[in-house]
Amino acid sequence: LKENFLDHKNILICTNAIFSENKVKEFFFVKENSITKLGKHWASGIGSFNKQHILDHKSKRFNITEDDIEKIEIEFITFDNLVDNYKIASIDNLQIDVEGAEFEILKSINFEKISVKSIQFESKHFDGTFFEGPKLKFIKEKLKSNGYNLVQLDKENILAKK
């Protein structure tokens, strides 16, 4: 990734994951050789901090097992640390699709510290798949109280725009 963007001085590559606290966590994903074995190219996009989330994709045509899952450790930093480390004052468009951790990231953003013009995020995993519960309601209220208008783009995604 770094090599692809060497000529783009306005792009900064951060190898940390963003979360609500600084810590190291295990990340689970489908092994490369299992993607071929399972016969589903889209399996390469399945990753989670919860192994069970991956196993829940099991169906008659997608017979994934624990042997198909690999894990690595990832260092997390908070959104505020990212902003501080890279001296970011504003963001035009923030896109968040992190397989269920959207709530933790959005909850941790300090809108008094950084200006974000628009935020698009996947909302389907906040309170259970496609269920609007207290977590999603909390984030919607936080965004509205910080001057954002919310648009439901489809059944999975919301756009918050100033």
Task: Say what each PLM segment does.
Residues L1-K162:
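Phosphate/nucleotide-binding beta-alpha loop and adjacent structural elements of enzyme active sites
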